[in-house]
């Protein structure tokens, strides 16, 4: 089918969601061999969608999530003064974690920075999380973060050793 019209009276938004959710779940169970990822559809508020995904219609298959890391720049063991000053003036700092990118060539990072500029941004700062004896950060701004601040950043963002963080 291409379209489904529902005639419902005296209902709330949740009633419509429940009916459509059950209809779609049962349809896919009956006619598809694929296993459903979930039987309850995730519900994301408009504000959360814009903050976490940068759009009001996110593709949840895309693992990139925008994280607010503003609080990191109030720490004494973070010395990235440009961002610290911005945060003091009320700005927010958000980042995206890219998984398993420690072995990517420099051109990978340069191309992402170029893309951000083409899209109207002023560029991206980034670093990759590594662990030799201790957790450290490699990249243009890596030296501004202590081991403890990186651990906190990893906790906030879900980043792991080998991931890169773009601000």
Descriptions of predicted regions:
Residues 1-167:
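Class II aminoacyl-tRNA synthetase catalytic cores and aaRS-like
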């Amino acid at each position: 089918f291409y379209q489904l019209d529902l005639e419902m009276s005296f209902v709330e938004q949740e009633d419509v969601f429940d009916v459509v959710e059950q209809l779609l779940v049962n349809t896919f169970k009956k006619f598809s061999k694929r296993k459903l990822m979930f039987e309850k559809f995730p519900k994301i508020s408009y504000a959360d969608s814009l903050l976490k995904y940068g759009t009001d219609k996110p593709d949840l298959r895309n693992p990139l999530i925008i994280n607010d890391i503003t609080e990191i720049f109030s720490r004494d063991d973070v010395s990235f003064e440009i961002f610290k000053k911005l945060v003091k003036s009320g700005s927010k700092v958000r980042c995206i974690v890219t998984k398993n990118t420690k072995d990517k060539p420099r051109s990978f990072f340069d191309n992402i920075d170029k893309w951000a500029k083409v899209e109207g941004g002023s560029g991206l700062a980034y670093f990759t999380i590594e662990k030799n004896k201790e957790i450290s950060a490699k990249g243009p701004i890596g030296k501004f973060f202590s081991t403890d601040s990186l651990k906190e950043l990893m906790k906030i963002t879900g980043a792991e050793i080998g991931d890169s963080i773009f601000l």
